[in-house]
């Protein structure tokens, strides 16, 4: 198999027209729905186990409580008194990104390997950042944009809009690189190298790197929002 056989494109499964515009259901949409359904199933299962009246906490309860406590502590330590407002968003965001990143372990194409997905997530965070800024400063944001001199206004505006772009590119680039590396390995290496070795590659690119990128995106979200309240 040559390099020409390697395919990294997003494929369309079904196309239809709406108001004269051609729309399609593609790979990213399908895997995003699958990830969301898995996340919902895990949440419902965890809730069901927690609500059960056991004489002693079972393994599921202990694991769920440990994860929630660690996540809560992380958000509170980074956002302080403002943590309560953003707790659900940050934890849901990180859960979705992590499941998306590790979906490659199960033969799926990670939704976060699509720039549209990562930019959408970064855009939601950007709206929250700007909302916190406006709520805190009001018209004082104009003064911030003109700081330290009015001539810096264009640069400050560009730096504001660079936030969602840089956040989305960082996540997209790392996940996309992992899918490309794994795709090249499967396509170009001899058959005997595809036994055993890919498990270690998936463990690094999908799980380890995926966990790091989830943490980085979540931390940036918390830090950027918190800074707007200072």
Segments from the language model and where they lie:
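Selective transmembrane helix interface/packing segments
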Residues: 1-230
């Amino acid at each position: 198999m040559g390099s020409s056989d390697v395919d990294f494109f997003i494929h369309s499964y079904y196309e239809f027209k709406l108001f004269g515009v051609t729309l399609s259901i593609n790979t990213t949409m399908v895997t995003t729905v699958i990830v969301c359904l898995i996340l919902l199933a895990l949440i419902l299962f965890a809730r069901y186990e927690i609500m059960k009246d056991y004489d002693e906490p079972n393994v599921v309860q202990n694991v769920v409580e440990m994860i929630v406590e660690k996540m809560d502590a992380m958000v509170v330590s980074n956002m302080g008194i403002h943590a309560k407002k953003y707790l659900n968003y940050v934890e849901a965001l990180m859960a979705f990104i992590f499941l998306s990143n590790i979906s490659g372990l199960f033969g799926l194409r990670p939704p976060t390997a699509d720039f549209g997905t990562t930019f959408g997530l970064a855009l939601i965070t950007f709206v929250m950042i700007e909302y916190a800024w406006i709520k805190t400063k009001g018209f004082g944001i104009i003064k911030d944009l003109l700081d330290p001199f009015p001539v810096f206004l264009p640069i400050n505006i560009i730096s504001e809009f660079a936030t969602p772009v840089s956040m989305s590119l960082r996540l997209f680039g790392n996940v996309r690189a992992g899918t490309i590396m794994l795709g090249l390995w499967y396509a170009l290496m001899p058959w005997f190298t595809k036994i055993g070795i890919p498990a270690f590659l998936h463990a690094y690119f999908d799980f380890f790197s995926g966990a790091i990128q989830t943490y980085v995106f979540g931390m940036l979200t918390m830090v950027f929002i918190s800074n707007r309240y200072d």
